[in-house]
Design a protein with these regions (language model features):
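Secondary-structure edge/capping motif, primarily at the C-terminal ends of alpha-helices
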Residues: 11, 15, 42-47, 128, ...
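Extended amphipathic alpha-helical scaffold segments
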Residues: 2-12, 32-39, 122-125
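Short, solvent-exposed segments of well-ordered alpha helices
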Residues: 18-29, 49, 53, 105-115
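Internal amphipathic alpha-helical repeat/solenoid segments
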Residues: 1-27
Length: 197
């Protein structure tokens, strides 16, 4: 993955002066590198908290690239900032347990719409693949659909990562706190032996 990033940088595949429509069709797939880095690193269980934090950083990288091309809708940008607890300046805000719960309890209508949208994208991708896998690199509709379905996956993954980080933080806090919940029973005083006269 890092080799691909070096190639992207050296060949200047992406530019701040471009719009999304200016990106070559065969280069759209390179926009997904940071996304797949996040997906891959999430599979590691050692140093789990660090792994999850890196996963969020890769999603940030993916989001920032999309933003630089103004690819995302205002609603998507707003949703991302809400999920990552960031204000308009991009600074991390303190979150409450209620916010974490709300992430997992999305509006039912939104979930249904997201499911339908994801299903339509998946069907479109499969249809294009069936028609001719050898011409996929030239098919702009395919790569845009592929990009969009992975944006949805990112939105689905972030709340899960946040919840897992919260759980790890809670466990760490419990371990560090002194065990003062249960007061120790005072030892009974020993009776002094009376000295014989």
């Amino acid at each position: 993955m890092n080799d691909i990033k070096v190639k992207i940088y050296k060949e200047k595949i992406f530019s701040d002066n471009e719009e999304f429509k200016d990106i070559k069709t065969e280069d759209i797939k390179f926009m997904l590198v940071a996304f797949y880095q996040s997906e891959l690193i999430q599979k590691f269980m050692v140093n789990r908290k660090n792994v999850l934090e890196f996963a969020l950083k890769f999603y940030d990288e993916f989001f920032n690239l999309l933003q630089s091309y103004e690819y995302l809708s205002k609603e998507q940008v707003k949703k991302y900032k809400k999920l990552t607890h960031k204000d308009e300046e991009g600074e991390k805000q303190k979150k409450t347990p209620q916010q974490s719960f709300e992430e997992m309890s999305q509006n039912r209508t939104e979930k249904i719409e997201m499911y339908k949208y994801k299903k339509n994208l998946s069907e479109k991708i499969k249809k294009i693949e069936k028609e001719g896998i050898d011409k996929i690199d030239e098919n702009r509709e395919y790569w845009i659909s592929y990009l969009n379905i992975n944006i949805v996956k990112m939105f689905e993954s972030i709340p899960m990562i946040n919840m897992e980080i919260d759980a790890i933080n809670h466990m760490e806090k419990m371990k560090k706190e002194p065990q003062q919940q249960m007061p120790k029973n005072p030892e009974p005083k020993k009776k002094k032996k009376k000295s014989k006269a």
